[in-house]
Amino acid sequence: MSTFNAPKGIPEYFPPESAAFLAVRETLADAARRAGYGYIELPLFEDTTLFARGVGESTDVVSKEMYTFADRGGRSVTLRPEGTAGVTRSVIENGLDRGQLPVKLYYSGAFFRYERPQAGRYRQLQQLGVEAIGVDDPALDAEVIAIADEGYRRLGLTGYRIELTSLGDETCRPSYRAKLQEFLRGLPLDEDTRKRAELNPLRVLDDKRPEVRELLADAPLMVDHLSVEAKEHYEQVKTHLSDLGVAFTENPRLVRGLDYYTKTTFEFVHDGLGAQSGIGGGGRYDGLMAELGGQELSGVGFGLGVDRTLLACQAEGLAVGDQARCDVYCVPLGEAAKRRLVTIAGGLRGAGVRADVAYGGKSLKGAMKGADRSGARFALVLGERDLEAGSAQLKDLASGEQRPVPLDDAVAAVREALQP
C-alpha cells in the first residue's frame, strides 16, 4: 500500500488514458493556432489582488474557491483559478497592446479551485483558453466561438450545444441591475443570497439550487433591456455565427460565474456529463483592461475544460488519440542480441519510428506479452541464431505473419512495413 496519496480532487492521467488527454488538448490548441493565435505561458500563481479585481470579489471563485496563501515575503498570492486575468495582466505589463491589434493568444495548463470534488469538478483542472484583446468587433466574437466549435468537431463530438446570450454594456447594465434588484427584494431569499443580490444581483441568477431557480422563473432578462448598440452587436454575432455554419441556441438566462463579462456570453454544454454539463465557456470583456491598469481596450475569449472534454468524448464512446505507446517492440533473446537491438531501436527513433525494447532479460513468451500490451504493430525479434544469420524476425502482431529482415537494413524495413 502506498505511503502517500494524491491530494483529494486532483485527477492523474497515465497510459493509455493520458494519450487521449494529450490528444484532446492538442486538438483544441491546433484549432486556435489555425486562427492565428500564439501561445503564452503564464505563472501558476499571481498577486491575489489581480483575481479579486479582475474576476470580482463577489464571485464564488474569489470568495470561496481560491487557493490563497502568504509567501515568505508576506505577499498574498493565489494559485490561478482562471486564465483571462493573467493574460490581460501580461498584455499590459509587456506592452503587447502597443503593437498589432487584436492581440491573439492561447494558453493551456493547470488551474486551481477549492471545490467539492466530484466527477468533472476538480480542485486542479486542466484548461485551454484563447484571448483576443484590442478590437470590439462582433465578427471576432464569432471567430472565438467558432474556434472552440471546430476543436470539438475535430474530436468527433456531436452531443454538445452552444448556448448564447448578451449581458449588455455599460449603457444598459445599470438600469437592468436596478430592475433585477427590485425583483429580488420581493423574493423570500435566504440571508446570504439577499446580501449577494445587493452586492451583485447578476450573481443570484447564477445560483444552481432548484429552489432558487424556481423563484427566478419570472426574473427580468438582460436581453429584453439591451441598449441599441449592445443589441446590434449581439445580432451581428448571431449573423456571423450563422455565416460560419456554427449552430447555437439562445439562452437568455445564461450567466457566467465571472464578473468581467459584457455583451456576448456563451457556454458549451454536453448533456452526457450529468450535473457538470458545462465543458467550456467564455465571452466578451470590455472593461477588464482598464480595470487592471491598461488601455480602454476590449477583449473576448474562452476557457475550455480539457478534463471535461475528455469525459464528454468518453461519454460518446469516442476513441481519441493513439493508444499505442510505440510502433515496433524490439525483443532481444540474449545479451548480444540486446546490444544490437538497443542500437537498432535508437536508429528507429532517429528515423521517426516509435520503438521500445523488452528490457530485463524476459523470456520470449513474457516479452511478446509486453509487445501486445504496448499496442505496437510489429515486434522485431532477435535470437542467437538470427544474430549469426545477420537478420531479425519482423512479426505483424495483428496477423501473426513474420518474415526475416537484414539487421543492416532493419530500420528501412520497419519504416517500409509501417507505411499505409
UniProtKB/Swiss-Prot annotation:
It catalyses: tRNA(His) + L-histidine + ATP = L-histidyl-tRNA(His) + AMP + diphosphate + H(+). Keywords: Aminoacyl-tRNA synthetase, ATP-binding, Cytoplasm, Ligase, Nucleotide-binding, Protein biosynthesis. It is found in: Cytoplasm. InterPro entries: aa-tRNA-synth_II, aa-tRNA-synth_II/BPL/LPL, Anticodon-bd, Anticodon-bd_dom_sf, His-tRNA-ligase, HisRS-like_core, HisRS/HisZ, HisRS_anticodon. GO terms for biological process: histidyl-tRNA aminoacylation. GO terms for molecular function: ATP binding; histidine-tRNA ligase activity. SUPFAM superfamilies: Class II aaRS ABD-related (SSF52954), Class II aaRS and biotin synthetases (SSF55681). The keyword Transcription regulation does not apply. Disulfide bonds: none annotated. It is an enzyme of class 6 (ligase). One of its GO terms (cellular component) is cytoplasm. Its EC number is 6.1.1.21. The keyword Cytoplasm applies. PANTHER family: HISTIDINE--TRNA LIGASE, MITOCHONDRIAL-RELATED, HISTIDYL-TRNA SYNTHETASE. Homodimer. HAMAP family: His_tRNA_synth (MF_00127). This is Histidine--tRNA ligase. It comes from Saccharopolyspora erythraea (strain ATCC 11635 / DSM 40517 / JCM 4748 / NBRC 13426 / NCIMB 8594 / NRRL 2338). The lineage of its organism: Bacteria, Bacillati, Actinomycetota, Actinomycetes, Pseudonocardiales. The gene is hisS.
